[in-house]
């Protein structure tokens, strides 16, 4: 998912997206360990999506802190 699409989501939706991505990563790692993973590059994609979501969440936290000061 692109960062532009993620920025359009609300904070609650981002938290939900983060949870679903972490769950997907867990399942992919499990499939990798059992030798059932069809697309190993998907792990990399999911890890990067998790990083994107975390970055956007952090950007919003920093923006809120600046407004409060």
From Swiss-Prot:
Pfam families: Ribosomal_L29 (PF00831). It comes from Carboxydothermus hydrogenoformans (strain ATCC BAA-161 / DSM 6008 / Z-2901). NCBIfam families: L29. The keyword Nucleus does not apply. The gene is rpmC. Belongs to the universal ribosomal protein uL29 family. CDD domains: Ribosomal_L29_HIP (cd00427). GO terms for biological process: translation. It comes from the Bacteria. One of its GO terms (cellular component) is cytosolic large ribosomal subunit. Disulfide bonds: none annotated. Keywords: Ribonucleoprotein, Ribosomal protein. PANTHER family: 60S RIBOSOMAL PROTEIN L35/50S RIBOSOMAL PROTEIN L29 (PTHR10916), LARGE RIBOSOMAL SUBUNIT PROTEIN UL29C (PTHR10916:SF0). GO terms for molecular function: structural constituent of ribosome. PROSITE patterns: RIBOSOMAL_L29. This is Large ribosomal subunit protein uL29. InterPro entries: Ribosomal_protein_uL29, Ribosomal_uL29, Ribosomal_uL29_CS, Ribosomal_uL29_sf.
């Amino acid at each position: 998912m692109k960062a532009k699409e993620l920025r359009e989501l609300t904070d609650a939706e981002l938290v939900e997206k983060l949870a679903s991505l972490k769950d997907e990563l867990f399942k992919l790692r499990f499939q990798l360990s059992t030798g059932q993973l069809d697309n190993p590059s998907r792990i990399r994609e999911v890890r990067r999506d998790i990083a994107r979501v975390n970055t956007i969440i952090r950007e919003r936290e920093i923006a809120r802190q600046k407004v409060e000061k």
